[in-house]
């Protein structure tokens, strides 16, 4: 009976931030797997994955999100779409909903800020089955 329980346990997805820029001291890429893997964030429950960014370009960066095993990457509908930085811990943060036309490999979100404005940023992705996927960013000033 214990074996059945272990078999039913869900394996965490491999979720990646794709960028050509240097994040956390590591040059990224737009391939899967990338050098920037998001980790499950149990404080949100469901299938939310997060990446804390403590070292980033001076005034902004661009990115897409990929889930290993999926043929298309999550991206905004238009290139350079701005992504709002929510204050850390914001209830109901402003997020970008991933609709059916938000998959591909040509567009990227743009995250902008002033130099030294944030101590760190956290990129969050909710890929919970049966809900609209979404991406949001929180910042600690």
Please identify what each model-predicted range represents:
Residues 13-58, 68-88:
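Aromatic-rich carbohydrate-binding modules that target alpha-glucans
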Residues 7, 34-35, 115:
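Intrinsically disordered, low-complexity regions enriched for glutamine and histidine
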Residues 2, 28-30, 134-136:
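Generic detector of ordered, mature protein regions
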Residues 53-62, 66-141:
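The feature marks proteins involved in alpha-glucan
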Residues 1-14:
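Bacterial Sec-dependent N-terminal signal peptides
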């Amino acid at each position: 009976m214990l074996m059945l329980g272990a078999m039913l346990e869900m394996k965490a997805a491999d979720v990646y931030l794709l960028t050509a820029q240097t994040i956390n001291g590591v040059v990224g890429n737009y391939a899967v797997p990338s050098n920037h893997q998001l980790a499950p964030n149990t404080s949100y429950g469901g299938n939310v994955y997060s990446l804390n960014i403590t070292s980033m370009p001076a005034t902004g960066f661009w990115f897409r999100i990929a889930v290993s095993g999926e043929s298309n990457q999550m991206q905004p509908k238009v290139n350079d779409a701005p992504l709002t930085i929510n204050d850390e811990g914001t209830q109901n943060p402003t997020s970008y909903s991933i609709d059916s036309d938000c998959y591909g490999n040509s567009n990227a979100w743009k995250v902008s800020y002033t130099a030294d404005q944030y101590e760190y940023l956290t990129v969050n992705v909710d890929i919970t089955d049966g809900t609209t996927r979404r991406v949001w960013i929180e910042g600690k000033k």
